[in-house]
Amino acid sequence: MMNIWHDISPNRIKDEDFFAVIEISKGGKAKYELDKETGMLMMDRILHTSTHYPANYGFIPRTFADDGDPLDVLVLCSEDILPLSLIRCYPIGVIRMIDGGEKDEKIIAIPFKDPTYNTFKDISELPPHIFNEMSHFFSVYKELEHKVTTIEEVSGREDALQIIRTCIDTYSDKFCK
């Protein structure tokens, strides 16, 4: 059985052009995440708050982030994308958070083939409301679970590229030697 985290070609995962794996469709409340052993999606929980994911949410294969998981990605798209779909994207920014006392970075990405969004090249170009929805969601989505999340910083494309490169290198060091 294929494990989408590991078995996608490294040629398809570059800092400026990568395939994201969607775990949660925009508008969803069910929190799915990668089961690292099988490569399947596993339901982690239903969100306790009345909020829903403001964008398609997933990960970048062949990356390893500081939290021990593949690097998280929010894909801004005019359509809801089905879980376990691959979508070719480019990064426009990053949200840096603290989640449960640990660093947690979320890349903001755009599909190459979505004409509604593919004119945006940096998070600073987004309409403010789009970013405000994402920020609000990540600051409250665990509140009723009595867990604290804090947004520390939002950065543009160049910082996102650096984080992706680091997570690709960390993955390579951990799994490809």
What kind of feature is each model-predicted range?
Residues 1-177:
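Hydrophobic N-terminal alpha-helices or hydrophobic patches in metabolic proteins across all domains
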